[in-house]
């Protein structure tokens, strides 16, 4: 990404949020599809700017979000603005977030955190902060704002009672729900070959109305046990043939079990 393009994005007042993305090379295409569905853009680097407010914990690939307060040419300008505008937080913590794009030395990262923390009105709390703040350098721009991290609580879904080696991976399942729905929570979803319920669990966790069908009675029972384990109604899973589905749904997420039946 060129410096000119980054400067254009930083200067766009509609871009209120900065998102940092982390995915493996094997996941890149899946990640790009998810970003396009959520933000209507494909990132050229490990970050993107957007005017869409999106909880990073809803995505397997967004590491953190910054609610942008300032984007400036230098750290000194940001420090002066904090002082002049009397920015105030109680129980706060300042973090330097590495961008891997025009980053600064370890010593200068510590200096930036220290100097910003010193001019904010209020008392810091390094160990149990109520508010986390971020300072980031992207090429020749400095970004300051409120930091929201992905809490990765959804990873506990890997600990479901029943799993199969041929089941869809958790990260992929979560991304597929976001890709299929474009973050529109009004949509209803059907997974007609739900297996042990991996996609169903992610959709439920993201707040969607979803139903699962599984033709194998033993596997359907395991899927019911899995979703009940995480506090959901086991009746969401039906043991039956997809050809007998009569209800209408907005979205179908289908992972056909090739070679198993």
Task: Annotate each language-model stretch with its function.
Residues 95-99, 147, 254-257:
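Short loop/turn segments at strand-loop or loop-helix junctions that form parts
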Residues 98-101, 133-136, 178-183:
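A positively charged, amphipathic N-terminal helix/segment that binds anionic biomolecules
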Residues 168-246:
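Conserved S-adenosyl-L-methionine
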Residues 238-261:
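S-adenosylmethionine
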């Amino acid at each position: 990404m060129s410096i000119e393009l980054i400067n254009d994005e930083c200067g766009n007042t509609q871009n209120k949020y900065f998102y940092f993305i982390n995915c493996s090379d094997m996941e890149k295409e899946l990640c790009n599809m998810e970003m396009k569905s959520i933000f209507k853009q494909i990132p050229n680097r490990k970050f993107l700017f957007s005017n869409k407010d999106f909880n990073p914990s809803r995505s397997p690939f967004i590491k953190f979000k910054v609610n942008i307060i300032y984007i400036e040419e230098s750290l000194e300008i940001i420090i002066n603005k904090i002082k002049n505008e009397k920015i105030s937080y109680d129980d706060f913590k300042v973090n330097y977030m590495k961008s891997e794009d025009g980053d600064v030395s370890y010593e200068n990262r510590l200096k930036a955190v220290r100097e910003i923390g010193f001019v904010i009105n209020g008392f810091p709390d390094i160990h149990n902060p109520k508010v986390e703040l971020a300072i980031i350098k992207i090429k020749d721009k400095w970004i300051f704002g409120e930091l929201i991290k992905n809490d990765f609580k959804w990873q506990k879904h890997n600990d479901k009672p029943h799993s199969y080696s041929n089941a869809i991976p958790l990260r992929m399942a979560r991304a597929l729900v976001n890709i299929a729905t474009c973050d529109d929570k009004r949509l209803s979803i059907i997974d007609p070959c739900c297996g042990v319920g991996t996609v169903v669990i992610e959709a439920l966790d993201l707040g969607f109305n979803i139903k699962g069908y599984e033709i194998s009675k033993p596997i359907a029972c395991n899927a019911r046990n899995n979703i009940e384990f995480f506090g959901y109604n086991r009746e969401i899973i039906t043991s039956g043939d997809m050809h007998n589905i009569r209800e209408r749904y907005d979205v179908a997420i289908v992972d056909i079990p090739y070679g198993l039946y």
